[in-house]
Amino acid sequence: MYTAASSKQETAKTDTEISPKPDIRNGFMTPAALSQRVSADGSTTINYYYARNKYNIKFVSEGSVVSEGRYTYGTLMPTPVAYRAGYVFEGWEPAVTQTVPAKDTTYTAVWKEADDVVYTTKYYLENESGEYELDKTRINKGTTGQNVTADKEQYDNRLYHLTDDLPSGTVAADGSLIFRVHYDRNTYSISFNSMGGTVSTEKKTARWGSNVIAPVPVRAG
């Protein structure tokens, strides 16, 4: 459907052929000029109908196309929803208008690092056999790309000590960063006093909590 946009009147001699040049309108296809002879009663009318142009509209994020298409000028802009793990969407560059503009346009997503991305720390304790068993798991939050260090767990230092330095890493956008922290059992020396007798060994070294077999003392008389 067409609606009247503007009109203008001109004068010319009766029976002369006129061919007014159509105006150029942004976003519309310019029609070909029409010719007509001027009537003596002033009823001569030339109508120009402008069809809307179509333009290529593309939305991209991090080099990948989110959506693209060819859309009619002035119609509602089909703006897509963009998502990127570990980031907050801040809008499109350039800013998106409500309707399709009169030119081919590429819009690029603008992102900001999210500050609530999870990373995981798993704590392992050494058992009596010298193997490690998962004791607890903690979920922390950080900013995408942030360098973080695992927290130290408050175990009784009479029983356990850190095997190595606390690990560090970069918070992954997809929440995949996992720290594994190991605690060894403390080792203690155990002495045996035979009180004047003799034993096969006077000292043993053992992990906390492990079974220790005491030597049998021997004493003459």
What role is predicted for each listed range?
Residues 1-221:
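Secondary-structure capping and domain/repeat boundary segments
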